[in-house]
Swiss-Prot record:
PANTHER family: TYROSINE--TRNA LIGASE, MITOCHONDRIAL, TYROSYL-TRNA SYNTHETASE. The gene is tyrS. HAMAP family: Tyr_tRNA_synth_type1. The lineage of its organism: Bacteria, Bacillati, Bacillota, Clostridia, Eubacteriales. A motif ('HIGH' region) lies at residues 40-49. This is Tyrosine--tRNA ligase. GO terms for cellular component: cytosol. Its main location: cytoplasm. Its EC number is 6.1.1.1. InterPro entries: aa-tRNA-synth_I_CS (IPR001412), aa-tRNA-synth_Ic (IPR002305), Rossmann-like_a/b/a_fold (IPR014729), S4_RNA-bd_sf (IPR036986), SYY-like_C (IPR054608), Tyr-tRNA-ligase (IPR002307), Tyr-tRNA-ligase_bac-type (IPR024088), Tyr-tRNA-ligase_bac_1 (IPR024107). Catalyzes the attachment of tyrosine to tRNA(Tyr) in a two-step reaction: tyrosine is first activated by ATP to form Tyr-AMP and then transferred to the acceptor end of tRNA(Tyr). L-tyrosine binds at Y35, Y168, Q172. A motif ('KMSKS' region) lies at residues 228-232. ATP binds at K231. Homodimer.
């Protein structure tokens, strides 16, 4: 049987290891318990988290046991990695709500039945921790000089790094120590932006428990130009259908750049590599077939086959190939809004994030109403604009929404 490490490397997941040869041997000989941490900074996971869950799912399919750690405790501080400013502090009530929402989402992707995976919250051991005891037990193993040289702190030192955030590395390292002690967890997986924090955890386990511990980082989801993927005009690409509709989600992947198709097929689907290579080798207009497969498969994993099929049908209907128009994202508007400015209605319907963005679209010729380009910022929406009680809004080349009179 192939080592899961070969699968992960072939599909492009692995960025860095702490101990590559030992990790390979461990994954061949044992069913390894490993963990990935997720901070509950919002009430939904987004596409950046999805790649981490795919990483976990490949490991679980190979017989290893994942621990999904929700950072209910560390979220009270906020991770400074990759941030230029201190994160806004959240209330305990907000964190608890976000944790509950994220738990529900995770269960779609990871099998938690019969102890095949474990869900834990570090609030259980961090929030009641005695601070002096923590410093004596954990702080003694950390060098401030070494911490200050870590990439996650370097970029913050000039702008100001609070002592609160400086503790984050100790707390994340302590998570690994607790999981190692309680569940014999031997490995931490995470995004490449977590490398410094992960090394700290590995070293803490090795020093304090005298046990072997390992870390592997996953590549971040970036496009061919090195920019993070998963951002839309309305913000992040969420996994919650209330925040990003299955249709919008499908359309995002249907419209990725040609150069990004192969990477996305590798990282975000379970399609066998032979088929990934075949799809990725398509050229010209044929690459659109690969994009349709990508969009359908990713949407199916996140929202289920039924929603993926509806999104596909909606896209086909809008591009003149038949299909069901009823699945296009729809906003119901009361008749009392007739005569209001179109841009105000689009902002209220969350079709555009702001009036300024709406004006930019109009200026660039990127906003259409029933196939006619909107040229006037102050265009009002009148009853005459509605055909059979609805209007079709098009943003850019391929984003559609319907407004119906309620």
């Amino acid at each position: 049987m192939a080592n899961v490490l070969d699968t992960l490397m072939e599909r492009g997941y692995i960025k860095q290891f702490t101990h590559e040869a030992e990790t390979r041997e461990l994954l061949e000989k044992e069913k390894v318990t490993f963990y990935i941490g997720f901070d509950p900074t919002a009430d939904s996971l987004h596409v950046g988290h999805f790649i981490a869950m795919m990483f976990m799912a490949h490991m679980q399919k190979a017989g290893h046991r994942p621990i999904a750690l929700i950072g209910g405790g560390t979220a009270t501080i906020g991770d400074p990695s990759g941030k230029t400013d201190m994160r806004k502090m959240m209330t305990n009530e907000t964190i608890a709500h976000n944790v509950a929402c994220i738990k529900k989402q995770m269960e779609k992707f990871i099998d938690f039945s019969d102890d095949k995976a474990i869900l834990v919250n570090n609030a259980d051991w961090l929030l009641n921790q005695n601070y002096v005891e923590f410093l004596r037990e954990v702080g003694v193993h950390f060098s401030v000089n070494r911490m200050l040289s870590a990439e996650c702190f370097k970029q913050r030192l000039e702008r100001g790094l609070s002592f609160l955030e400086f503790n984050y590395m100790l707390m994340q390292g302590y998570d690994f120590y607790v999981l190692n002690k309680k569940y014999n967890c031997k490995m931490e997986l995470g995004g490449d932006d977590q490398w410094s924090n992960m090394i700290a955890g590995v070293e803490l386990v090795r020093k304090k428990s005298q046990k072997s511990a390992y870390a592997m980082t996953c590549t971040l989801l970036t496009n061919s130009e090195g920019q993070k993927m998963g951002k839309t005009v309305n913000g992040a690409l969420w996994l919650d259908p209330e925040k990003t509709s299955p249709y919008e989600f499908y359309q995002y992947w249907r419209n990725v750049n040609d150069a990004d198709v192969e990477k996305c097929l590798k990282l975000l689907t379970f399609i066998p590599m032979d088929e990934v290579r075949r799809l990725s080798s398509l050229e010209g207009s044929q690459i659109n077939e690969a994009k349709k497969v990508l969009a359908f498969e990713v949407t199916k994993l996140v929202h289920g086959e039924e929603e993926a099929t509806k999104a596909k049908q909606a896209a086909e209907a809008l591009f003149g190939k038949g299909g069901d128009m009823s699945n296009v994202p729809t906003y119901e508007m009361g008749k009392d809004k007739l005569g209001s400015e179109l841009l105000d209605i689009l902002v209220e319907a969350e079709i555009v994030p702001s009036k300024a963005e709406g004006k930019r679209l109009v200026k660039q010729g990127g906003l259409s109403l029933n196939g006619e380009k909107v040229a006037d910022f102050k265009k009002t929406l009148e009853e005459a604009d509605f055909e059979n009680g609805e209007v079709l809004i098009k943003r850019g080349k391929k984003n559609y929404n319907k407004i119906v009179l309620a």
